[in-house]
Amino acid sequence: MALIEAVSASKIYRSGDVEVAALSDITLSIEAREFLAFVGPSGSGKSTLLNLVGCLDHPSSGTVTVMGTNVAALNRTASAAFRGEHLGFVFQEFNLVPVLSAYENVEYPLLMVRNWPADKRRTQVMKMLDAVGMAEQAHKRPDQLSGGQKQRVAVARALVSEPQLVLADEPTANLDHATAHKVIALMKQMRDEFGTTFVFSTHDQKIMEAAERIVMLEDGRIVKEQRA
């Protein structure tokens, strides 16, 4: 069974009498351990598809199944529990907790979904912060960090619990060239070591070059797929 399965999935947004089809009749299978990128122009449906795969939204019609679970069958509480247990996210807006330090932001998923002792948590948090070059900034709050530094903390937070699936919306958007390559290498290392599946929404050529499968969207439809 595929890790992710979309069958004739569509997403329609309504505003009064106006309907906008963000996604139309998407059928797609993603296997475990894939390193895959959704690409396409702004408004093509990349982020909407990522939201469906990440149990952040439900399709208007059709089905999206993640790890054997039909996402439309989950209520809000069950969706949150499923995401916390199995998924990691990197958002363009970072979504860091402003009153927590970088260390505490990265530790947060472990406190929520992993019953690890404090010493194991600390080792894992510092390992991830060091991997993204942020160990020396661990004590700083988000308002004391640059955009690129916040992005690195967000990446560390997404990876810290060693999730089965990581969904990343433009994860390298605020990173310099060298750091972006380092982050991509870290993600591939996690895929190789832990079998993590990575799905990206991106315009970044560096991620497109690293991806082993590219799914191209246009006007809410898949128009082309290619493998490395």
Give names to the regions the model predicted:
Residues 2-217:
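ABC family nucleotide-binding domain
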Residues 214-226:
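H-loop (His-switch) and adjacent beta-strand-loop-beta switch element
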